[in-house]
Amino acid sequence: MNKKKILIGTDTVSGIAPQILKAISLASNENSLPYGEDIYTKKCRNIVRKIFEKQDLEIIPMMSGTASNSLALSSFLRSYGNVLCHSESHINKDEGGAPEFFSGGGKLLSISNSIGKLTSKEVNEKLDELNFKGKQNSKICGISITQLA
């Protein structure tokens, strides 16, 4: 019996679905305006605006999860700031320092526990600890809630 190996660690280790490859191939034969003015980005933007019922909503299509996460974090994380996250979170373990690089030196400040997810109690304790230390502390700019329990 032949068994096919399945890699589930990330979507970047496998090929793409035939339907996606066909759509990309067809689109590559067209001439389009750049910088979000192509018909595909416009269609996507309109769909997202309809879903969120917000006509001035903007989207930025990205090519990878690391780019997406780094851009999102760098939009509010400054060189003097921190983002709280779990020590086992994807942004802390798998982004290779990209969020810190693209934010100009902002820092991911991790919290560890045995369940692999942040709890509101731990977040509040960390915020209290940082507030107690005073003004020389880096500012908390955000909390990664992807691993919130």
Regions found by a protein language model. Give the residues of each.
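N-terminal amphipathic/basic leader segments beginning at the initiator methionine
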Residues: M1-A23
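Structured catalytic cores of enzymes that bind and process phosphorylated ligands/cofactors
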Residues: T10, D56-I59, I143-L148
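Conserved N-terminal alpha-helix of the aminotransferase class I/II PLP-enzyme fold
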Residues: A17-G65, S87-E88, K93, A98
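Solvent-exposed alpha-helices and their adjacent loops that cap or buttress functional pockets
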Residues: I51-K54, F76, I91, E100-S103, ...
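Conserved core of the PLP fold type I
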Residues: D56-L77, I111-N113
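Conserved PLP-anchoring active-site segment centered on the Schiff-base-forming lysine
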Residues: S75-K93
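PLP-dependent aminotransferase-class I/II
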Residues: S103-L148
